[in-house]
Amino acid sequence: MADYQGKNVVIIGLGLTGLSCVDFFLARGVTPRVMDTRMTPPGLDKLPEAVERHTGSLNDEWLMAADLIVASPGIALAHPSLSAAADAGIEIVGDIELFCREAQAPIVAITGSNGKSTVTTLVGEMAKAAGVNVGVGGNIGLPALMLLDDECELYVLELSSFQLETTSSLQAVAATILNVTEDHMDRYPFGLQQYRAAKLRIYENAKVCVVNADDALTMPIRGADERCVSFGVNMGDYHLNHQQGETWLRVKGEKVLNVKEMKLSGQHNYTNALAALALADAAGLPRASSLKALTTFTGLPHRFEVVLEHNGVRWINDSKATNVGSTEAALNGLHVDGTLHLLLGGDGKSADFSPLARYLNGDNVRLYCFGRDGAQLAALRPEVAEQTETMEQAMRLLAPRVQPGDMVLLSPACASLDQFKNFEQRGNEFARLAKELG
């Protein structure tokens, strides 16, 4: 455990994670200073009076006088103020690094462009099914520092690339990169390999590395080694097995679960289940309770969630598809009896949309494109695309056209922040309109 006594600590970024950092230091007899570029950041009213605060901008004077800077994942390490501090030899960490220095129980660590919240939650459910006292959080749910507890027997953390950039003490019992597709390219000017390099930090000092056999970018930089266990659709130690019209989860040649016993559906969710099972096995959880958890887990909101099934039409909320890879995962292997009415749009974060084109060639596809990058998305297949300013306009346009057997799918391939507070608000709005229009 690290000793912070007498250190001049500056925390950048408030919100729930920033407050958890403040509480962490106060409990150790250190009163940090806090700054946030927002004038009235969330959590400002909960900050103890003794804590100095600076809002509306960064305070370079405070930063250059610090012994330790705890940076929010929301601020790029390339920011001039942080670059200057790093050049001056000032240590810059994030909340996950603070957590890793303190945690006494094993850690399962999960990252990836898509599926990480589902897999994190699933591994947590597997641990609970085994009667293990588990703490689940990080990039979802509770900030990691709020999970610290002497009685905790296992931690399961979802980690973003931004969080991994400031983490060096992670020693996971099992770690995975589920997949690597273009995302956050606005934060990674050197492209996909720079983004991948941040993700790969999760494998440093990991006991077992769970890699995706179908995605070479998830492999450690020197290639697979004796620490690696793999999962995949047809390849890998953990893979899918198709026999006589049925699909099984299979581990090293042994069929362990028929997917019809699972509440989750879709090929991408079956591979998520394989990854979760590989992590749970590596963490020493009993296989039987892990499989039981797979039969009861219903999935997370806004992730290929059926919000309405009415008059033979399925309305599916996949608002969490905030990048191209996630929408690809939703469309890959998707079967629709009638027409697929696909809602795309928002802020594409400088991504290349062209990989989507191959999924949009069918005669039964109609595109409804909205938001900041709607025109770019409509250009993927203009003859079947219509462009509107908002998602609501798009839904009101398509609603009179749907027939029994059709599917209305919101899988936007973009962030929501151009028109919504977050992907949850976008998904809730879709669900509300589906119930009104369907």
UniProtKB/Swiss-Prot annotation:
GO BP terms in the entry: cell division; cell wall organization; peptidoglycan biosynthetic process; regulation of cell shape
Pathway as given in its UniProt record: Cell wall biogenesis; peptidoglycan biosynthesis
Chief place where the protein resides: cytoplasm
Catalytic activity annotation: UDP-N-acetyl-alpha-D-muramoyl-L-alanine + D-glutamate + ATP = UDP-N-acetyl-alpha-D-muramoyl-L-alanyl-D-glutamate + ADP + phosphate + H(+)
E.C. no: 6.3.2.9
InterPro entries assigned: Mur-like_cat_sf (IPR036565), Mur_ligase_C (IPR004101), Mur_ligase_C_dom_sf (IPR036615), Mur_ligase_cen (IPR013221), MurD (IPR005762)
pH-dependent activity: Optimum pH is 9.0.
Secretion signal span: none
Cofactor or coenzyme needed: Mg(2+)
GO cellular component terms given for this protein: cytoplasm
Annotated keywords: ATP-binding, Cell cycle, Cell division, Cell shape, Cell wall biogenesis/degradation, Cytoplasm, Ligase, Nucleotide-binding, Peptidoglycan synthesis
UniProt keyword Ligase present: yes
Listed SUPFAM superfamilies: MurCD N-terminal domain (SSF51984), MurD-like peptide ligases, catalytic domain (SSF53623), MurD-like peptide ligases, peptide-binding domain (SSF53244)
Cellular compartment(s): Cytoplasm
Binding residues annotated for ATP, in chain numbering: G112, S113, N114, G115, K116, S117, T118
Coiled-coil ranges from the UniProt annotation: none
Sample GO molecular function, one term: ATP binding
HAMAP family: MurD
Family, as annotated: Belongs to the MurCDEF family.
NCBIfam families, sorted: murD
Role summary: Cell wall formation. Catalyzes the addition of glutamate to the nucleotide precursor UDP-N-acetylmuramoyl-L-alanine (UMA).
Protein name: UDP-N-acetylmuramoylalanine--D-glutamate ligase
The organism of origin for this protein: Escherichia coli (strain K12)
Lineage of origin: Bacteria, Pseudomonadati, Pseudomonadota, Gammaproteobacteria, Enterobacterales
Gene: murD
